[in-house]
Amino acid sequence: MPSRANSLQFAASRVQAYVSPATMTAFSILLFVGTFALSLWATWRVKAVYAKYSQVPSSVGLSGAEVAAHILQRAGIGDIQIVEANQLLGDHYDPMNKRLVLSSENFRGTSTAAMGVAAHECGHAVQHKLAYAPLGWRMASVHLVGFANMAVAFLPIFGFVTHMLRPMLIILCFAWAIIMVFNLITLPVEFDASARAKRILGEMGFYRSPADAEGVNRVLDAAAWTYVAAFITALGYLLYYLLPLLGGGRRHWD
């Protein structure tokens, strides 16, 4: 039975047979720059859209905290604390401590953006109550992805200092693969939470004008792109570190 090293060498030889080292290098650089640009664009877009609709008041005139309280009460969830965090767009649902964290702008704000963000985080709380499988998978992998994030942050420095480049690349590939899978699992979790938020707001009568639905939809749709960008970026980094192991520059990594 062939070893992993032999399998990797075989894969490298097959890639080298069809792709030149220069092409591999150019592709890896293009991939790196492209995914980085996508990440920047997604971050810029969600901030720009949020800034716009945070100035549009909702027709119901309720703060994000009040909207969240109404949604949780309707869902029969009474064991979650709604807390304020002094961090822009630091909103999240903490399933471990049963806390729904809203930034000050969304906790106190009465904008359509605040209403949408609060409802989205409530969507995660509803997922938790219903034992939504992808949320459970993400919760189970949090510690593992934490180690992977530490690896991708410090291993490049360690590898270049010790000149153990090939082992560094192999470990980085595994780390980015873990991060990529985590971000892949995150996609259905976030998309489902947004879908629940839009539906619940409509069912509860929070949309009292077309501007209400527009603001919520635009903010949540823009946020969705950040999760897509995170997945594509992780995939890009995985390929970026994997290509030197398979490509023509292989002897420099031995």
What are these regions (language model features)?
Residues 172-183:
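Alpha-helical transmembrane segments
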Residues 142-165, 170, 200:
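Post-HExxH zinc-binding segment in Zn-dependent metallohydrolases
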Residues 25-31, 159, 170, 235, ...:
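Hydrophobic packing and interface segments
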Residues 1-26, 249-254:
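Short, strongly hydrophobic alpha-helical membrane anchors
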Residues 43-148, 181-254:
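Polar-ligand-bearing catalytic/cofactor-coordination segments
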